[in-house]
Amino acid sequence: MITTYSTFLFNFLSQFQYLVNIPEPLILFGLYYGFLTTLPISFSHIVVIRNRLIEGKTSSVMAFCGLITGQLCMIGTIYYTPLYKLFIKPHLILLLSIIYSFFYWQRLRNNQNYDDLREAQSLINVRNFFSFFDSFVFQILNPILLPTPIFFRLNNVFLFRYSNNLNFFLSFFIGSLIGNFLFFNALNWIRYRFEQDSNVIYPVLKLLINKSIIPIVFCICLIPIAKYSHIPFCTMKQKEGQSSYSFDKNWPNIIFDSNQPHRPIRIFSETKTDDNLNINDNLSKKQTSQFFFKECISDGNVRISYTYPSTLANFQTDLSSSFQDFSLSEQSFDNLYSNWKLEKLSRKDNLNNLLLTKIKLLNNKKEWFYKHFQNKFGTFIKDDNNYNKFVKKSNDVRLKQSSKIQIKKSKLLTSDIRDISTTQSGFYDLKKNKLKSFISQKFKMNSNNSTLPVWNHLNKQLLQNELKRIKKQLQDKTKNIKENDFNNLKLLKSNIETIDNTINDIHHNKIKQITSVDLIKIFATNNKTLLLETLAFNKKITQKDNFNFNKLFQHKNKKFTTNSGNENTYLNLNDIFKNIKRLPKWRTFSKHVVYDEVSDIRRRAIKSNSKLKIANKDSDIIIFEYKKSLNFRARLPKGSLRARRKNKFTWKLFHNNLNSPFFIRSKQLLNKTDIPFLKYNENYLNFFKNFISPDKNINYLNNDISEMRRQELLFKWDKTNVHILRSMVLVGQAFFRKYIKLPIFIFFKNLSRQLLYQPSEWTKDWSNWMNEWYIFCYYDGTELAKDQWPEMWLQRGIQIKLINPFYIKPWYIQKSFIKNKQNKKTRTSYLTVFGSQQELPFGKKIRMPSFWKPVRREVSKSIKLKLYFPFLTLQKNTIILFEKVFNKKRINEDNKTIEKSILNKKNEQLILKKDEVIPNNKSIAGKLSKLDFHNQNITKTSIKNATKQILIKNEYNSLLKENKNLFTKNKIVFLKIKNILNKLNLKLIKVKINFTYKIKTVLKIISRNLLKFYSIIQFQLENLGRNNSNDLSYKNQLSYQKDFPNFNNFCLNQANIIQNLCKNNILKHKKLNQNFQINSKNLNQTNIIDVNPENIKAQDFKNLLENIYTFTPTINLWDKLSTNNWKISVQNNWKQKSYNNYDLTKKALVSKNLNFISYFYQNNLINNLNKKIKHTKIFNLSKNYLSLNNLNQNQIKNFDFQNSLNNNITYKKNIKNFTIRQNVPSQLRRWDWKNNKIKKFVNRLLQKNTILLKEEVFNLIPFFDRFTIQNPMIRNWSHPISSILDDEIFTYELLDTFLQINKNIDFLHTKQIEDNLSSNSNQAIASLPLSSTTAENFLYYLTTVEDLISIEDKKELKILNSLNFNKSTPNYIKTNVVEKSLNENLSKNLQSILSKETLDSINNTQILKKFLWASYRCEDLACMNRFWFSTNNGSRFGTLRLRLYPNLKN
């Protein structure tokens, strides 16, 4: 038997090994692919994470099961086509799933309480089923609507060439299960770490997790909307010959229409003859083909594929051409590389020569250049014999023709190019032009009485007039100056002379061009301050921080003279009012107004309009009420492309803040110094905070905050686009509530009551339903009449108010009519879009009473009664039986006791009477006769009483026999037992409640005390274990205590410690002596060491204490300095602990073993343990510093600090640094990086050889009407607010030209360029050669040298320049080999090249993509023989059967 069993095992193992070895790579690869499918996190994974961290284990397990079943369904869709049609194809179910995701988000928002986030432990709970359904639905979502990476990973698995193999499929399934279970275990570990490591209670942390998951879910819900972001009724236009109704098509086909244009459509002009055609005029759109068509083989048949990849077709043509031309042979192989090299070098030389000849023609033949330039790139338009305007020829790739567009010169370039010279000074002027990109020149030129910037040249006439005005002012001032002030007179006369000289030079054309900076340089440096004083304007005002603009407008013509700081900063009011740019008032209702259709700035929205009639005039005045909300959303101008419209996402409709993309083009941030009144606003806030106490008026503040939030929401959603949707939904919600929702609820409620054999409540429900009525209000909440609708409610918005809102009750409680009449109040609320109710519009939500809570209460009561009733009946029956038996025994015992008591009484009487017998013998005989007579009387009376009792008993028995029919013994007993049981039940209930409560309280107290006691014991045992290990080291420490001084002095302070340490030579060690040396140096500088203690003064004490880091005063001194309350409490504490061990007049009692520290409390067990801990710490600190021999002595003389100090020493602690920027607004902080870049750039300009200097810029003030700002940096990039409206300045084409100037313009001579071209033509391409003659008329910002050559030549020249032809030829080219061994040598050489060169250049991410990521592996090339996924059509997911390699046609 043993041999047969062993042979069986051997055969089984060999067969198993054979089975494993064959499909081993497939199994491993399947496990790898299965594990990769679990790596990406989808929507359902987020649901599982949320349920595990918040709702507990059961709900997370259910969600996890839903995730796995969803993945199985996705696999089924790949392998089984009916499931593919059911799930993946766009149907109504998938659209409903998107709506379900929004409902899921809304459900998460409502779960904000602890009760909602409580863990559901039972499997029957509804939340567990919801969690399963959520994860299952989100896993099955269509990848068209919501991109799921798991589905694409599964597609890669299916497209593997061995996907039909069973071993691969099983191993893939096992790998996916392993990955999912690892994911679930990781979630359990994260939950455990949260519970253990968090400083917050876990229920509080649940709320934080739930709040952080809600925005993630909302973003995921918005992904399908972002994919189909175009809005049909806004962007789509009606096609020719198409019906205006969209009901002709099926509804899903409208959304998923393949013919619907999602890309820019070709644009052509109707009038092609006009050369100066503007792209925004007379445009029309036509739909054309968007895909690449190609023949392909599908299932053996040639078919046209519209999803055929264009890259594959190009590759096919290249392969066919290369195989036709290329032919290998042994003779041609040797000269292959050399021929190719010679050919490319000759081609490179030809291109370089061509470029050089064209550059030479630029300098020599000007007319040829313009002709050539006009034919190739565009045309020039002449204006006064100067080429100022240029029309560029733009090649549209989508059109097979060229169109000419006029390119305007950038408004960012304020100065003309002809003024720039090739000298060094011109180069710095060009650098300054970079600052001009932040200033709108168009605004400054159009504004009245505005001044040109510093870098522009001044006009001669304006300059002469300005100088004459200055001369008059100077002459007037010379009259007022006294004769004694010779210096000022000389300065004034010198200024007048310089002005006269400049006027004469300008008049005789000696000075042709001059700037304002050059004009200031003419004056002497000493005269500038006096010049500023003399050139002040007639109307002056100084700029203050707390400037009131309302008063400024009222007192426009008055004079103000105030000072801000040391210097006067002047401001002219009239010039400010002149420079204000008036905004245009749009007349929306006037038909003759023509708007600018080119710009994308929207007009201000009008809320309402009204007409005002004037008494004595026929005409009316139209009054417009504009909306408060701003709309900076870019408008779609006429003829805009589809690509421009497609980028208008739905969530970008509400960019009303400064963070909108509109301001990215013209955003200019201000520093904190630029923002007016910021400092004072902060002070006002702090001032008002002091009036509000933290304890009072809390409810008042909360109400104010809620009201502010409500007003903010009202202001935020006051938009026409929102009002259209919201008002329609509100009206639909009201109709749905009144006529659908509530009647259905009433019907089902009464039907269920009838099924449960309860009376129906139709009349009450319908009467309450009729009492609910609706009032339509304006958007602000102002009410209207009952049946009145507001005007233009779609555009202006609407609110719906509910009066006596109806909510369903399970039953009605009967109350008296009077109480209802007294307590009756009209309830009001406002309806929301989601169907809920609010107290005020956008206010607090009202929670309606739930329908199921009273039902649950009643059901729980009935269940409890049913459970406890049989137990109570058994208890009653047992008590009754016990009472019966007990009563019988008790009656018998009572009778016996009564009989015994009677007999005992009689015997006692007899005994007493016998004891009363007279002992005298004489009297006995005389009294016997009396006793006999007395006994006879007793017997007679007893007989009489007995007869009476018998008669009474007989009468009683007769009465009982007569009334047997009325009362029975059983009934009497039953009544007695019932009363007894009721009393017992009450007592038992009270006893149970009290007993359980007391037991719980006692157990809680015991558990708390035990835990405290256990923690104390554990802590002390650990300390004992540590201290026992250090006992030996502590004993060794005692041997070193002889060197230490005795510090048991009662009046101990820092100075005494330093003195004793110096005496005993302890501070020899470097580490100990580090801080001491610093103090000693400072003490030597103060010269206090040699002074006697008697001669020391208070100032000496201060100097000494300032040089020492810290000072710890003595106990006596501290006792005097401390406050009374603290002192008394400390003294009482010391007296209670150890009264005998401490006295202020005597020294402290200290044990012999401890000579270092004094203690003032009793010696307990805990105190002893603390002492040991302290000793160990002291030993560990001093162990490194025990080499204390041969130390220096008397480094510091004795100082006694026992005398009291009257002067306090203060230190700067906890003083807030106000220079630190706090509470910075998010709008400014977000753009900080741009502001810092600009600052660095401007600093670099102002450093070297620049004309703009601080003094010079400051001295320019009298020539220009502007604010006087001392910091030139702020003024240089100060941006006018109204220039935001100059939108044309910030277009993309003009910004591109500005960037080209910064990169490409370098004024180099043509000879240098020719030399560079001969050496390396790449450097020549980066610069444009311009001589002094051509620079005057040539528009250099339009082209580069690359434009002179064709596009193909440019690419070819760049590639040829990048190649290095000087390298030696590879080894595999030099060797003559046979065709058979050619592949071997090539493979070896390629391996060596790859190992040396390419692997070093590969990044880590590329290695991960090649070897770990599934979509980048080589096996995915085999996917093409099964399916080809379309990459061109990005809006849809399409598959098509293709071959792996296309047929190459000869």
UniProtKB/Swiss-Prot annotation:
Where the protein is mainly located, per its record?
Answer: plastid
The alphabetical list of record keywords is: Chloroplast, Membrane, Plastid, Plastid inner membrane, Protein transport, Transmembrane, Transmembrane helix, Transport
Task: Enumerate the transmembrane spans.
Answer: 29-49, 61-81, 86-106, 132-152, 166-186, 213-233
Where is it located? Answer: Plastid, Chloroplast inner membrane
Q: Please list the GO biological process terms of this entry.
A: protein transport
Q: According to Swiss-Prot or TrEMBL, what is its membrane topology?
A: Multi-pass membrane protein
Query: Would the keyword Transport turn up in this protein's UniProt record?
Result: yes
Task: Report the InterPro entries cross-referenced here.
Answer: TIC214 (IPR008896)
Source taxon at top rank? Eukaryota
Assigned GO CC terms = chloroplast inner membrane
Self-association state and partner proteins as the record states: Part of the Tic complex.
Task: Name the protein family.
Answer: Belongs to the TIC214 family.
Main function: Involved in protein precursor import into chloroplasts. May be part of an intermediate translocation complex acting as a protein-conducting channel at the inner envelope.
Entry protein name: Protein TIC 214
Instruction: Write down the species.
Output: Chaetosphaeridium globosum
